[in-house]
């Protein structure tokens, strides 16, 4: 998901 690029916190859910 692209939101991981905007918010570092979302990277947990993006992976």
From Swiss-Prot:
Induction info: Expressed equally in exponential and stationary phase in rich medium (at protein level).
Protein name: Protein YadX
Species this protein is from: Escherichia coli (strain K12)
Underlying gene: yadX
């Amino acid at each position: 998901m692209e939101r991981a690029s905007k918010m570092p916190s979302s990277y947990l859910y993006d992976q």
